[in-house]
């Protein structure tokens, strides 16, 4: 965003004010002044200490209206599952050739799905995939024999999230071009899932802050009352 446009957006935003979710969505759409279809992101500050394994918040959620992004998917599997993966819409399908490509530095996909019987080989590239959030994981549904279901869910808008070292959770929840109602439904689905996953070991206030932002826009705070756990 150009300097003047960003300053104009800041001028329209009270950084101390918390908005109802519907109003926050309207505000973020109003102040986003870019010539492309900007992504809207949500950030939550959680009252957890991720240094403790029993306070790590991690999960997946199906956004009712998707993210608006075309997601590229690699399925790593043996030949018996390849046709099923292709039919489900996977962009790349294979086994040893993709392990080798990744070893050589290729990571040109958004999501990797794998069958359990190839995880031993895929472990060779865990140090490459892990830091990029691409390593398949049973908890997120990306290690499975039902590759067709996994591919279809990811393509339809299933996203994965995980708390970072500072106790924050970030996720894309749609595009500025979405209807406000669609964004509200996506955001509500995300918030409810994060609240549902509150660790029993977490003490004090769990949801400490919620904010929306779009590509290169200031953030807009969201009232927490309906989502406090």
Swiss-Prot record:
<keyword id="KW-0694">RNA-binding</keyword>
<dbReference type="Pfam" id="PF00687">
    <property type="entry name" value="Ribosomal_L1"/>
</dbReference>
<comment type="subunit">
    <text>Part of the 50S ribosomal subunit.</text>
</comment>
<dbReference type="InterPro" id="IPR023674">
    <property type="entry name" value="Ribosomal_uL1-like"/>
</dbReference>
<keyword id="KW-0687">Ribonucleoprotein</keyword>
<dbReference type="InterPro" id="IPR023673">
    <property type="entry name" value="Ribosomal_uL1_CS"/>
</dbReference>
<dbReference type="GO" id="GO:0000049">
    <property type="term" value="F:tRNA binding"/>
</dbReference>
<dbReference type="InterPro" id="IPR005878">
    <property type="entry name" value="Ribosom_uL1_bac-type"/>
</dbReference>
<dbReference type="InterPro" id="IPR016095">
    <property type="entry name" value="Ribosomal_uL1_3-a/b-sand"/>
</dbReference>
<dbReference type="GO" id="GO:0019843">
    <property type="term" value="F:rRNA binding"/>
</dbReference>
<dbReference type="GO" id="GO:0015934">
    <property type="term" value="C:large ribosomal subunit"/>
</dbReference>
<dbReference type="GO" id="GO:0003735">
    <property type="term" value="F:structural constituent of ribosome"/>
</dbReference>
<dbReference type="GO" id="GO:0006417">
    <property type="term" value="P:regulation of translation"/>
</dbReference>
<keyword id="KW-0820">tRNA-binding</keyword>
<comment type="similarity">
    <text>Belongs to the universal ribosomal protein uL1 family.</text>
</comment>
<keyword id="KW-0810">Translation regulation</keyword>
<keyword id="KW-0678">Repressor</keyword>
<dbReference type="GO" id="GO:0006412">
    <property type="term" value="P:translation"/>
</dbReference>
<comment type="function">
    <text>Binds directly to 23S rRNA. The L1 stalk is quite mobile in the ribosome, and is involved in E site tRNA release.</text>
</comment>
<protein>
    <recommendedName>
        <fullName>Large ribosomal subunit protein uL1</fullName>
    </recommendedName>
</protein>
<dbReference type="InterPro" id="IPR028364">
    <property type="entry name" value="Ribosomal_uL1/biogenesis"/>
</dbReference>
<keyword id="KW-0689">Ribosomal protein</keyword>
<keyword id="KW-0699">rRNA-binding</keyword>
<comment type="function">
    <text>Protein L1 is also a translational repressor protein, it controls the translation of the L11 operon by binding to its mRNA.</text>
</comment>
<dbReference type="InterPro" id="IPR002143">
    <property type="entry name" value="Ribosomal_uL1"/>
</dbReference>
């Amino acid at each position: 965003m150009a300097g003047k446009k960003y300053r104009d957006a800041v001028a329209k935003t009270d950084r101390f004010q918390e908005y109802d979710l519907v109003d926050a969505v309207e505000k973020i759409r109003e102040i986003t002044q870019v010539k492309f279809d900007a992504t809207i992101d949500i950030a939550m500050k959680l009252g957890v200490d991720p240094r403790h394994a029993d306070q790590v918040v991690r999960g997946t959620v199906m956004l009712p209206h998707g993210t608006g992004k075309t997601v590229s998917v690699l399925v790593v599997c043996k030949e018996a599952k390849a046709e099923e993966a292709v039919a489900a819409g996977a962009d790349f399908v294979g086994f040893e050739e993709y392990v080798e490509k990744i070893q050589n530095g290729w990571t040109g996909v958004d999501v990797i799905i794998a069958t359990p019987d190839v995880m031993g080989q895929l472990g060779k590239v865990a140090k490459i995939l892990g830091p990029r959030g691409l390593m398949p994981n049973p908890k997120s549904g990306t290690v499975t024999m039902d590759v067709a279901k996994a591919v279809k869910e990811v393509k339809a808008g299933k996203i994965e999230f995980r708390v970072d070292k500072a106790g924050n959770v970030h996720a894309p929840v749609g595009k500025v071009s979405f209807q406000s109602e669609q964004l509200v439904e996506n955001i509500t689905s995300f918030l409810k899932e994060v609240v549902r996953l509150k660790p029993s070991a977490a003490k004090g206030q769990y949801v400490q802050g919620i904010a929306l932002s779009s590509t290169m826009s200031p953030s807009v705070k969201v009232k927490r009352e309906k989502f406090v756990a």
